[in-house]
């Protein structure tokens, strides 16, 4: 990932010599370059960052698609992730942003959970209630991803605070993976990124609120960023 002032750029190299390149723009910020999303606009935006421009100066477009693709708002959320006789995988029920690359892991956690439901409750009278519980957990997980991503977008132009806030995601991932390795914990019952843990959810909300307060009121940016870092580490102990 390359962090820019109002966006971030991904470069994903595949093993056949093709690299996927894209920009995710923060639409809540004033854009340095406005107008239609065509090749000239892309070149102008990339040209704002010399190191990025050098990386891309000799690239050629592959076919398909053979052209730049543009999408409007990417976030989506269904009101219901499961019902009495059906269920969506998490990535189908909602999508926030690719910043933390949560899509595959989140989907696999849903596959595992649904497989256990089908194995143990296929003919159970409780299946509807259990699927409702699945829905509620998926909504909690998407809310957690949303909060973890949102704080990072708020600090795109403030790298020290971006680093500090990003620690929330890594702590959540490590906690989730450690829980899966614990033989005493049923792995399929654990919510992705600890989303069903009230204490963890309160910690994320507290740090996010502290971030917003600092961004609105700080006069000494570096002093405030250092203070915020210390508060994040203290909250994560």
Regions found by a protein language model. Give the residues of each.
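FAD/FMN-dependent oxidoreductases across multiple families
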Residues: 7, 29-149
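Non-transmembrane, interaction-prone segments in cytosolic or luminal domains
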Residues: 4-9, 16, 39-56, 96, ...
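C-terminal helical "tail/cap" subdomain of flavin- and related membrane-associated enzymes
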Residues: 117-237
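Active-site substrate-recognition segment that forms the wall
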Residues: 1-28, 81, 88-90
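Alpha-helix initiation/capping motif
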Residues: 26, 37-38, 49, 158, ...
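Short, low-complexity intrinsically disordered segments
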Residues: 6-8, 40, 84, 198, ...
């Amino acid at each position: 990932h390359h962090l820019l002032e109002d966006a971030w750029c991904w470069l994903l190299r595949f093993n056949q010599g093709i690299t996927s390149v894209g920009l995710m723009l923060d639409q809540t910020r004033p854009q340095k370059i406005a107008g239609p999303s065509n090749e000239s606009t892309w070149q102008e935006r990339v040209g704002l960052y010399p190191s990025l421009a050098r990386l891309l100066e000799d690239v050629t477009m592959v076919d398909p698609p053979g052209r730049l693709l543009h999408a409007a708002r990417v976030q989506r959320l269904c009101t219901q992730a499961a019902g009495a006789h059906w269920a969506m995988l998490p990535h189908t029920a909602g999508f926030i942003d690719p910043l933390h690359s949560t899509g595959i892991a989140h989907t696999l956690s849903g596959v595992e959970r649904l497989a256990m439901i089908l194995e143990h409750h296929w003919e159970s009278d409780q299946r509807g209630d259990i699927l409702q519980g699945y829905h509620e957990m998926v909504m909690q997980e998407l809310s957690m991803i949303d909060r973890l991503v949102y704080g990072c977008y708020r600090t795109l132009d403030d790298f020290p605070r971006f680093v500090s806030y990003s620690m929330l995601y890594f702590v959540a991932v490590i906690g989730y993976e450690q829980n899966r390795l614990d033989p005493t914990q049923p792995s399929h019952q654990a919510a992705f990124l600890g989303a069903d843990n009230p204490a963890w959810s309160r910690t994320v909300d507290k740090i996010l609120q502290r971030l917003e307060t600092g961004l609105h009121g700080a006069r000494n940016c570096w002093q405030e960023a250092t203070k915020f870092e210390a508060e994040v580490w203290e909250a994560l102990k």
